[in-house]
Amino acid sequence: MNKSIAPAPVVAAGDVKFGNSLPLSVIAGPCQLESRAHALEVASALKEIATRLGIGLVYKTSFDKANRTSAASARGIGLDAALAIFAEIRDSVGLPVLTDVHEAEQCARAAEAVDILQIPAFLCRQTDLLLAAAATGRIVNVKKGQFLAPWDMGNVVAKITTAGNQKVLVTERGASFGYNTLVSDMRALPIMARTTGAPVIFDATHSVQQPGGKGTSSGGEREFVPVLARAAVAVGVAGVFIETHPDPDHAPSDGPNMVPLRDFEALLRTLMEFDALAKKRPGAGTI
């Protein structure tokens, strides 16, 4: 273990750069990896949008949804089937890829085909998982637990950096507030930037999730995704995390809080304008 290693202020996944003072980048894709054809369809559409807008984009999808509300809910195609699809998205579509890992043993295998390993919020304090992810040398994106204060993420980041990996992102996704409800405290964004030194991501879609809100599955209020995303980008963040799907009402997981793919480009255009104003780059003031 190393001592007093600061996280990198700018983290690059291929050509996509995340930095709190850099132009906004985005992490986007469907909640669950449903099939090769579906993944390539969505990844190709997102690549076209990102190229048209000139914004950095990392493709996100999960090979296993290990924390579903009900044991009967669809979990995904599994790591074995997902690896070749992840590699194809990177090589053929040309997008960096992010996926969740839930167990230490998954990290090295997933790292063979993805650029960013994501630690789910419920697991953000699991030391062995964090150390295994750090050991791969890949970027590690840690979602802040709904039960943590933003300044508590300093200890989480330190577990990764003292293991020798400075490539860390921290993601805000709301805090538990009573039953089946999350709230987003925008103060958490600059606090996490200050106390961790890492690039900060705002998860706009999971922040409107209603955990367990539909009894055997989670609910969500997708109409508030643009509201919270605009607020976070106005504060100033390195990136936004937005789950999107061609038909979210029939998606196997997280449909109620995913943005329809047809609405994705317009939302990004707005967020880029807010970002330019927040960071006072040329072109700011066009909102």
Curated annotation (Swiss-Prot):
EC number(s) recorded for this UniProt protein: 2.5.1.55
Source organism per UniProt: Rhodopseudomonas palustris (strain BisB5)
Protein name, UniProt field: 2-dehydro-3-deoxyphosphooctonate aldolase
UniProt keyword list: Cytoplasm, Lipopolysaccharide biosynthesis, Transferase
Example of a GO MF term: 3-deoxy-8-phosphooctulonate synthase activity
InterPro entries: Aldolase_TIM (IPR013785), DAHP1/KDSA (IPR006218), KDO8P_synthase (IPR006269)
GO cellular-component term (any): cytoplasm
UniProt lineage: Bacteria, Pseudomonadati, Pseudomonadota, Alphaproteobacteria, Hyphomicrobiales
Protein's pathway: Carbohydrate biosynthesis; 3-deoxy-D-manno-octulosonate biosynthesis; 3-deoxy-D-manno-octulosonate from D-ribulose 5-phosphate: step 2/3; Bacterial outer membrane biogenesis; lipopolysaccharide biosynthesis
Matching SUPFAM superfamilies: Aldolase
